[in-house]
């Protein structure tokens, strides 16, 4: 379950550029719910989703995932509770790393990472099977750099 209560965010408070982006937003999604966030430009859609992900601290309110209050958790710790698919396929992957390295790094979300992105042979085989299901031939290109993929291919790797 995702629950946001009274989430507020003001950018540049007290300045001539002050922008009240979120004004007490409430949202409750139960497990299995599907939601679409719709609004005009500047309505606060991305700001709200970024607040949930922890891109910046909220001014007030609470955000819970599965009953765990993540309101004050840094973004990297929230990664164990939240997955994101970015609009821009260039985000969410590291273009200068191979497909296999991106998948290995993603599989360790929420864990401390060392200096190596390598994966174990059984993990590589699991990645190959997952990619084969996409029917894009990416399972044969595990050593290709993600930056060389099309936008759609890159989006699929990110997901």
Language-model features, listed with the residues they occupy:
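Q-loop/switch helix immediately C-terminal to the Walker
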Residues: 88, 96-112
């Amino acid at each position: 379950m995702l629950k946001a209560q009274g989430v507020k965010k003001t950018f540049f408070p007290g300045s001539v550029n002050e922008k009240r982006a979120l004004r007490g937003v409430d949202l409750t999604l139960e497990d299995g719910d599907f939601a679409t966030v719709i609004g005009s430009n500047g309505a606060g859609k991305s700001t709200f989703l970024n607040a949930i992900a922890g891109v910046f601290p909220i001014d007030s309110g609470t955000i819970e995932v599965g009953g765990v209050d993540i309101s004050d958790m840094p973004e990297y710790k929230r990664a164990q509770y939240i997955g994101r698919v970015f609009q821009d396929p260039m985000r969410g992957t590291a273009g200068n790393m191979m497909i296999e390295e991106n998948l290995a790094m993603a599989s360790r979300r929420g864990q401390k990472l060392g200096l190596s992105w390598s994966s174990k042979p059984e993990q590589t085989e699991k990645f190959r099977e997952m990619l084969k299901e996409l029917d894009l031939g990416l399972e044969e290109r595990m050593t290709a750099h993600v930056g060389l993929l099309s936008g759609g291919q890159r989006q699929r790797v990110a997901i």
